[in-house]
Amino acid sequence: LVVFVGAILLTFPLLAEALPGQPELKKQGTAQQLFVDGKPFLIIGGELHNSSSSSLAYMEPIWKHMQELNANTVLAGLNWELIEPQEGHFDFALVDGLIQGAREHDLHLVFLWFGSWKNGMSSYVPLWVKSNPQRFPRVVLKNGEKREVLTPLGEASWKADAAAFAALMRHIREVDGKQHTVLMMQVENEPGILNDSRD
């Protein structure tokens, strides 16, 4: 089981008006507490390896294993290249399958968005981003060395990432806005550059 600390974002307050019972953080004395369907909810979570959730077939035995561990929530990565394989064309079959798998096993989900960065690298961006460094520029270190990491200074990059993330959030709200299988979304994962501090 994984204890996790970090910047997490509740999914549905980002999108227009609140839905009844949606996951939310409430101040309880001096602490913040997660509430789901109006009741306190303690996450007992198991976090998957980076790409484990990229295959529904691979996930089949994992759901049962999480139940055996008495977990109530699975932390699973969603990578941009599988969500938007072609610019502006989204494939949410994996997202839907993960939500369905969690529901079938009485589990909740916390998704981790592997967008522009994952562990200081840009490994999970779509091919249409990887193959166009003119439009989606890369980091240049102070010694002049170039890295295959998207620069945070590239407007086209962050706009494309934001558009994909917004489409994903809208889809999750459409398919899960009433059932609250998805509790939270981590926005990006370890953004930055390995072995240097900035572009």
Model-derived features: where do they sit?
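Bacterial N-terminal signal peptides
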Residues: 2-13
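Solvent-exposed loop/turn segments at secondary-structure junctions
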Residues: 41, 49-53, 80-83, 115-119, ...
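Hydrophobic faces of well-ordered beta-strands that scaffold small-molecule active sites
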Residues: 44-46, 74-76, 109-112, 183-187
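The substrate-binding groove and active-site-proximal loops of carbohydrate-active enzymes
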Residues: 45-55, 77-95, 142-163
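Aromatic-lined substrate-binding rim segments of carbohydrate-active enzymes
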Residues: 58-133
